[in-house]
Amino acid sequence: WILLFIGFAIKVPVFPFHTWLPLAHVEAPTAISVILAGILLKLGVYGLLRINYPMLPDAVFWFSGAMALLGLINVIWGAMCALAQTDLKKLVAYSSINHMGYAMLGMASVIAASAMYGGNQAAAQAGLSGAVFQMFNHGTISAMLFILVGVVYDRAHHRDIDGFGGLAKQMPLYSGICMIAFFAGLGLPGFSGFVSEFMCFIGAFPVFK
């Protein structure tokens, strides 16, 4: 189970196997970043749900608390690292680590609250819905953010956040779309990211309280 988990955790990516993702996004062209964030990162969580859990349910159940803790670390660590970035593309990459942490948390709550262990069926349903919805939302939001970063990079030929002062005056429509995309990435109420993250917490709180 541990070897399978490490393999899928690298793909998610889960802390401390996350270090490859920001470097890969920075070097990749926009189209590859969109595919990586929109589709490929989800395969890690999908593999944990579709391969690890059915094959080794007892082991996954016993380690569900550790998986939830790693997901929570992803949420906090990804957000803190994103705040420290000056490269706009690397900021979006670290936000992906944060977003996938919510999916990990929701998935762990599904396993811990599974009915086959006499757990909370409502929490399991909320966690599963939250994890799947979060993966979908991350795919759309992060792909949109990487496209927006690619657009401004083609114009400015750099990604230094400090060099984008006054951009709203030159590109008002672009700035408005950016604001909507980043608000969605933040998970503010009214955007899809809030719903999925809230469902992950609803699934996790009754199980890991």
Q: What is the predicted function of each stretch?
A:
Residues W1-K209:
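Hydrophobic transmembrane alpha-helices and their helix-loop junctions in integral membrane proteins
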